[in-house]
């Protein structure tokens, strides 16, 4: 497939008060929630106005307590985070990692531990040897009713108007070992999973839906290597899914251009370009995205930690400083 955009960059847009200046953090233990609580005032003072808290299974779920992580954050902790974010005018968005990333290293996460029949590769890869991460089967009729209950609990606890559903790096999909998915089109399977969540979150619950964008990009045509784009057939899903989803378009290396930003914009999506720990790469991504700043669907910037926050983080993180300075004062 060809993923080419005719949308051309222009001069940096004027400063916009509504730019999202976001931070993605892992909040998967009680201690992580405590640190985030201490850091919220500092993050807000540094310019952060959106925090995406990746919780996944690490909340004291009531509907399915068997799916709680080892040290889940409590409802009371979430209530304090909500109050603090509201006080400091920070939008707090929970994240629940859907479809892929159902394991890490040798640890399989609660859903596939408690319900192994949901696994896309049932009975294969003992100790997760030989794979990156497990996935659940997008066609299993019993998986969505369970995970949607978890999403609903997070939305209610966080009093959230949006949910990030992850869906990055889904490498196991349409596998021959799955009796339901074998032989089926992987883009259609991926699109179905996305549309199922969209139906529940956006249409039924009336909240915004965010997701990572890498599996919607075709590595052969767009020029991204490695993890930033897909080579397993999921990319055509970009034309099969609702365009009111917010795409978090992550790129962690320095480049002259980032063609996925105009591609997603031209397709009709709102885009939140996303960086990690390389300050020069973050600056390059922010600067390139600002060439499309006159389009309000280019929402701003998201800085990721891919770990729990640390005390003093708000004063020390260079990517946060770069994003704040450039988005508030585009040159």
Residue ranges of each PLM-predicted region?
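Hydrophobic faces of well-ordered beta-strands that scaffold small-molecule active sites
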Residues: 19-25, 51-53, 92-96, 163-165, ...
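Glycine-rich, aromatic-flanked loop segments that form ligand/cofactor-binding clefts
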Residues: 18-22, 42-55, 82-124
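Aromatic-lined carbohydrate-binding/catalytic grooves of carbohydrate-active enzymes
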Residues: 44-77
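Substrate-binding cleft of secreted/luminal carbohydrate-active enzymes
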Residues: 272-331
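Short, acidic/polar
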Residues: 29-44, 149-150, 255-261, 282-288
């Amino acid at each position: 497939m060809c993923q080419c955009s005719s949308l051309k960059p222009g001069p940096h847009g004027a400063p916009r008060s509504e730019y999202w200046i976001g931070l993605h953090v892992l909040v998967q233990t009680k201690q992580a929630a405590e640190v985030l609580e201490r850091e919220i005032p500092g993050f807000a003072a540094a310019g952060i106005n959106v925090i995406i808290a990746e919780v996944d299974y690490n909340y004291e779920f009531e509907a399915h307590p068997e799916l709680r992580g080892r040290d889940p954050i409590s409802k009371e902790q979430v209530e304090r985070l909500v109050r603090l974010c509201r006080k400091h005018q920070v939008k707090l968005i929970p994240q629940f990692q859907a479809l892929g990333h159902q394991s890490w290293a040798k640890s399989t996460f609660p859903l596939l531990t408690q319900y192994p029949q949901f696994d896309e590769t049932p009975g294969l890869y003992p100790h997760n040897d030989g794979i990156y991460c497990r996935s659940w089967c997008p066609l299993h009729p019993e998986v969505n009713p369970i995970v949607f209950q978890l999403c609903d609990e997070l939305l209610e606890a966080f009093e959230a108007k949006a949910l990030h559903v992850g869906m990055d790096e889904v490498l196991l999909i349409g596998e021959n070992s799955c009796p339901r998915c074998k032989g089926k089109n992987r883009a259609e399977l991926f699109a179905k999973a996305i549309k199922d969540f969209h139906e529940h979150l956006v249409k039924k619950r009336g909240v915004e839906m965010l997701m990572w964008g890498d599996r919607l990009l075709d590595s052969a045509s767009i020029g991204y290597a490695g993890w930033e784009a897909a080579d397993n057939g999921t990319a055509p899903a970009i034309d099969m899914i609702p365009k009111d989803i917010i795409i978090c378009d992550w790129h962690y290396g320095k480049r002259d251009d980032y063609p996925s930003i105009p591609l997603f914009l031209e397709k009709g999506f709102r885009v939140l370009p996303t960086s990690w720990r390389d300050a020069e790469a973050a600056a390059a991504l922010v600067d390139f995205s600002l060439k499309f700043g006159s389009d309000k669907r280019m929402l701003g910037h998201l800085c990721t930690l891919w770990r729990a926050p640390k005390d003093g983080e708000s004063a020390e993180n260079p990517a946060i400083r770069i994003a704040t300075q450039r988005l508030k004062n585009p040159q």
